[in-house]
Regions:
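Phosphate-binding site recognition
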Residues: 1-336
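A cross-kingdom feature that marks ATP-driven nucleic-acid transaction machinery
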Residues: 306-483
């Protein structure tokens, strides 16, 4: 059963309904669900779906010819295969689809280009001369994000400016991901999402009839299951110096987020080299560099500023719990690793993913105009500002601190400060006062609202004071079941 991806399906169907030729580039990291999304889109439509392989150009051309000939095109009456790519690709115009769009999907298109670098030029010539004004739709799909972004979509590439649509597929959000385990409790949905993230391939390995703990033991920590070797497989497929990348990813997963800290923890002494490795991981969609939501452009461009974090929840889980315990897992001590390593730390581990869930919740509320104001920027904030200090005369002091979620309107005259707590105890009154104390200097020229997000409800004092302090309270049930 196909789950989610309504936005992607709408985008593709809208393009399909448009008149004239359509040339779509759809790309994203491996396992994100591109192929399945395209196959779902093709259902009920006459089409050719061709999956490229890592092979020689003559074999690729032969395989493409074989696939095209199955569509009963006129050429099959006098040839068994095309002799060149220009004739092969032009044959799209001969597909016997009547008034329907002649739909061609080329999956893993970078493999085709690697075997024959002239493919983009051939396609460009056909597009300019014939395809642009014809009833065709060609979708070029690929996982090699660096190739697509730096070469295929660059100004130097023959296809530059020809695409009528460019769509970068990202992993599913929380609300789509939890459709894979609809009967879980609200808390378990957050825990499962914290472990798996929004990668469909990972979500399908999960048995929704088993508990979160049992799934972790059976489908992640047990040698031989798909997810046990997934991280190692992906890194070896995409990168060369896997031992170094392992060290860097582990350092980030364990909470080292600054460039210098990552370099020291991973024992890559040269930060410039560490920066290059991190850049490669960012291109693969495994790591991202996060700057404060109000950072200026100069700060955003400086790799020494901001923090690095793993964007893939499953990578974060594996390097937090599996990677350092592989010897025990290889010996079959799955229960021991789970009981003594994973289970005690899982709620704390999930608290980071809960922040992502809360940010997604806020984005969805904005779509429905259910926030106090419309924000222009939303994200994490870090820097020096006021914090609560009862020993100080004013009750405040200046210190480095973070804000889980900060929304700022277009004029920077209205703010929403959000704090997220994923724990079994209610959001305490002391934590509430800590939240109110932050960014006090800005309150002289801006209106402030507050939003508290909690797994286990709120202290009664908070509930009593919330309205007069412009504080919105969102319990777990409200967040998880919003959509």
């Amino acid at each position: 059963m196909f789950i989610g991806r309504e936005t992607e399906q709408k985008f593709l169907n809208d393009k399909y309904e448009e008149s004239g030729g359509q040339l779509i580039v759809l790309y994203g990291r491996r396992r994100v669900g591109k192929t399945e999304t395209l196959r779902e889109f093709c259902k009920g439509k006459p089409h050719v779906f061709f999956s490229c392989t890592q092979t020689t150009d003559p074999v690729q051309l032969r395989n493409f010819s074989t696939r095209m000939m199955k569509e009963d095109i006129p050429a099959k009456d006098y040839i068994s295969a095309f002799t060149d790519w220009e004739r092969a690709l032009r044959a799209v115009l001969d597909l016997p689809y009547g008034n329907s769009k002649k739909l061609l999907v080329i999956d893993e298109f970078p493999y085709m280009c690697k075997g024959n670098p002239s493919i983009p030029s051939i396609l460009q010539n056909l597009w300019d001369a014939e395809f642009r004004d014809s009833n065709v739709m060609i979708i070029l799909c690929g996982s090699a994000m660096s190739f697509i972004e730096k070469e295929m979509l660059s100004e130097k590439n023959p296809l530059y400016g020809r695409a009528t649509g460019i769509y970068k597929m990202r992993e599913m959000g929380f609300y789509d991901a939890v459709k894979f385990f609809p009967d879980y409790s609200d808390r378990d949905k957050v825990l499962a999402y914290a472990v798996l993230g929004g990668i469909p391939h990972y979500l399908r390995q999960w048995n929704p009839g088993l508990s979160v703990g049992e799934n972790i033991k059976r489908n992640i920590l047990t040698k031989g299951c798909i997810l046990y070797s997934e991280v190692d497989f992906l890194l070896h497929q995409e990168l060369r110096e896997t031992p170094i990348y392992n060290s860097i990813i582990e350092a980030v997963a364990l909470g080292n987020t600054k460039l210098n800290d990552i370099s020291q923890k991973s024992l890559v002494e040269d930060t410039s080299k560490t920066s290059v490795y991190l850049k490669n991981l960012m291109e693969l969609g495994i790591v991202e560099r996060e700057v404060s939501v109000d950072a200026k452009l100069k700060e955003q461009a400086n790799s020494n500023r901001g923090t690095y974090r793993l964007t893939d929840n499953f990578f974060r889980f594996w390097y937090a719990f599996g990677f350092a315990n592989v010897s025990q897992l290889e010996d079959g001590d799955v229960n021991g690793v789970y009981e003594f390593v994973v289970e005690p730390e899982l709620p704390k581990f999930a608290s980071f993913a809960f922040e992502d869930v809360c940010r997604e919740f806020v984005r969805e509320m904005q779509k429905k105009n259910e926030l106090p104001f419309r924000y222009a920027k939303m994200g994490r904030w870090a820097g020096k500002t006021t914090v609560r200090d009862d020993s100080a005369a004013s009750g405040l002091r200046i210190a480095e601190t973070e804000i889980d979620l900060l929304c700022i309107d277009r004029t920077a005259k209205e703010y929403l400060v959000g704090e997220c707590k994923f724990k079994k105890a209610p959001f305490s009154y002391s934590e509430y006062l800590d939240t109110l104390a932050k960014l006090t200097p800005q309150k002289e020229h801006a209106k402030f609202h507050y939003a508290l997000f909690s797994e286990s409800g709120f202290d009664e004092k908070i509930i009593a004071e919330a309205e007069k302090s412009n504080t919105l309270l969102y319990p777990l049930q409200c967040i998880v079941n919003y959509i």
